[in-house]
């Protein structure tokens, strides 16, 4: 058998134009994103985070601005109403047998002594002789004295060296608050009745009126 002829037939059987199919190879660099893409992505994420934090900060700030006037208003209301820091309303209360009036507590003595002794007696009660601050308070005191025939020392005496009436706190009597009937001489003290205010000797025996400031309980 002629081997050259067989080999030639085999070669003749194959199509001379046939070639094996091949796929183009992809470069490894083609699958990689450019470096600036990564940089842009990082910058974008950082920007979004920064914007989010800014929005949160603005939200908190705006809420604070909105609530601040309300907080201040509540704080002022708490001070005016005498509320305690715990939020419970503080009660203003006078001791037993004391008469409340605005921010004061008043009490009338049951005994008669000179003005100086009345001053000491009030001090022992952590109080002072009555200081009348305005016409409204004068009317209130005279109203609670209705039906009483006695006169009552108050914290007002005549200072001869200054030739004027002064309260025990050092303030000068204002004539528009009350007028005193009687002499203006040394050792003169003021006494109040349910109708008038009189001048009498500080050494005379009379009742008196004490006052103290209302306390929180």
Curated annotation (Swiss-Prot):
Residues 1-45 are cytoplasmic. Pfam families: Lectin_C. It comes from the Eukaryota. Expressed in natural killer cells and a subset of T-cells. Disulfide bonds join 122-210, 189-202. The keyword Transmembrane helix applies. A motif (LCK-binding motif) lies at residues 31-34. It is found in: Membrane. InterPro entries: C-type_lectin-like, C-type_lectin-like/link_sf, CTDL_fold, KLR_subfamily_B, NKR-like_CTLD. One of its GO terms (molecular function) is signaling receptor activity. PANTHER family: KILLER CELL LECTIN-LIKE RECEPTOR SUBFAMILY B MEMBER 1 (PTHR46784), KILLER CELL LECTIN-LIKE RECEPTOR SUBFAMILY B MEMBER 1F (PTHR46784:SF3). This is Killer cell lectin-like receptor subfamily B member 1F. It comes from Rattus norvegicus.
């Amino acid at each position: 058998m002629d081997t050259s002829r067989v080999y030639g037939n085999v070669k003749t059987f194959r199509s001379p134009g046939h070639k094996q199919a091949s796929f183009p190879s992809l470069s490894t660099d083609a699958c990689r994103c450019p470096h600036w893409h990564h940089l842009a992505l990082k910058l974008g994420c950082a920007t979004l985070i920064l914007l989010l934090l800014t929005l949160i900060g603005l939200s908190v700030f705006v809420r604070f601005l909105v609530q601040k006037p309300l907080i201040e208003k509540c704080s002022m209301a708490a001070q005016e109403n005498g509320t305690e820091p715990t939020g419970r309303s503080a009660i203003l209360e006078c001791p037993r047998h004391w008469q409340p009036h605005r921010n004061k507590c008043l009490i009338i003595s049951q005994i008669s002594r000179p003005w100086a002794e009345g001053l000491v007696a009030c001090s022992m009660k952590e109080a002072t002789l009555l200081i009348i601050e305005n016409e409204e308070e004068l009317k209130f005191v005279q109203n609670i004295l209705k039906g009483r025939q006695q006169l009552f020392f108050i914290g007002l005496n005549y200072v001869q060296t200054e030739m004027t009436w002064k309260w025990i706190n050092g303030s000068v009597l204002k004539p528009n608050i009350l007028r005193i009937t009687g002499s203006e001489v040394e050792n003169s003290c003021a006494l109040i009745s349910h109708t008038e205010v009189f001048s009498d000797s500080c050494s005379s025996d009379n009742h008196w009126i004490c006052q103290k400031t209302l306390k929180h309980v």
